Amino acid sequence: THLIPATLEGRALHNVQNAMTAAAMAFSLGIKLDAIRQGLRTFDTTFFQAPGRMNVFDEHPFKVLFDYGHNAHAIAAMADLAQRLDVTGKRIVVLAAPGDRRDEDIIEIARVAAGKFDHYICRRDDNTRGRDGDEVPRLLARGLTEAGVPEAAIEQIHDEQQAIDTALRMGQPGDLLLVFADALTRSWKQIIKFRPEGTPVKTVSTPVLSEPEPAADPQALAREAELRALMEGTVRDERGVVFAREQDD
């Protein structure tokens, strides 16, 4: 598994399972083993390849795990990963749940995270999906306390940006921050642009202007136009996922 970056050297057991499943499916479709190996070795969980899917940022004094997990199974998998990573400091989590889930589903998200972290910050999404502004954080906090987490280890910060900022400012060298995010691009930028107190701002060198690009190949333009026609009527979200618009039967 050390040759499969998406498994984080085998610590991300759910991605070990995903890699095995993907390899088996590809092989059953007749894809050559060399191509399967190449795919597994070159795919990683950077924000650019898989936004919101176990992204790691370790350029702060602490490590940040960033994920879009929004159900109990996803939260449990990431909490398990947080336990498997080598952490010399504290484990801090920014926890959330979609507002259109049942109360018991939201409480279950809290339950599977309970006992895995030193500090919990409970928040809501920008879109509360019909719930009151503080309802989701309150249910999460309730689930944590019912599972035995001390009240002193639980914070309720409703706003996503404020919750993430609080976690970042709380982070110390050796800590691990697990951030469950909803507004992916905004939250990722917030994490990578954060500057801990006392950290000098990096100077930005003046970019070197590149040579003008040659005129586009007519065949390439034709292929691009054909692709745009095929994609007409679809919707792409900020994660890069493409959906077909719903049509009446």
Predicted regions located by residue number:
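Acidic-glycine-rich active-site phosphate/pyrophosphate-binding loop
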Residues: T1-H2, R53
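ATP-dependent carboxylate-amine ligase
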Residues: E9-H14, T21-D34, Q38-D249
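Flexible glycine/proline-enriched surface loops and loop-helix/loop-strand junctions
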Residues: P5-A6
